[in-house]
UniProtKB/Swiss-Prot annotation:
<dbReference type="InterPro" id="IPR040452">
    <property type="entry name" value="SfsA_C"/>
</dbReference>
<dbReference type="Pfam" id="PF03749">
    <property type="entry name" value="SfsA"/>
</dbReference>
<dbReference type="InterPro" id="IPR005224">
    <property type="entry name" value="SfsA"/>
</dbReference>
<protein>
    <recommendedName>
        <fullName>Sugar fermentation stimulation protein homolog</fullName>
    </recommendedName>
</protein>
<dbReference type="InterPro" id="IPR041465">
    <property type="entry name" value="SfsA_N"/>
</dbReference>
<dbReference type="GO" id="GO:0003677">
    <property type="term" value="F:DNA binding"/>
</dbReference>
<comment type="similarity">
    <text>Belongs to the SfsA family.</text>
</comment>
<dbReference type="Pfam" id="PF17746">
    <property type="entry name" value="SfsA_N"/>
</dbReference>
Amino acid sequence: MKITKNILKAEFIKRPNRFQAYVKINEKIEMVHVPNTGRCKEILIPGSTVILREENNENRKTRYDLIAGYKGDMLISIDSQIPNKVVYEALMNFKIEILKEYTNIKREKTFGKSRFDFKLEKENGEVYYLEVKGVTLENDGLTMFPDAPTERGTKHILELIDVKNKGMGAGVLFLIQLNGVKKFTPNHKMDKNFGEALKLAKEKGVDILAYDCLVEESSISLNNPVSIEI
């Protein structure tokens, strides 16, 4: 998917809270919005180069969103709104192998008391619920989720097990917001409960998928499947 708004580079200064950061643009310090509640501490390092997206909205306190950052030569997308958009584009273009037969794609659908990112249907009426998680944490080719404790994430995994137990298809797709990685694994040290829930989901037949992305400063798209170790 293309990012159609104005994109520019800046130097990262600091992040005083989850939603705000300070950057330097042409020697001027400016506050920007961070569209990611994760820690991203391996990416948002003082002095590093980050990518901003200009938001032309007079009602905003900040002019820019901080949407990506360079970790060495590697560009990592950190915009938490991006994964669902990338996966939707991939689903519409039948790029996810095991989901190619699902032709009716609906976003943000509920099942019981649960809300999932996607509800997919085949022409024969078979239903599949898909949850998407964005991944930004990487170390020497190993990617992990989450980078902060996530009760909500664990709840989603357990709800997918319930979907599967009721006879429908269920899966979670970890969208790795960078390219050229070797493996994905749950971050047991950060959130043991999430890791255990994911292991149980796999045992119960929930599909566990991971894909990396082709990331450029003004575009991002689904790339290749990544091996998973749970």
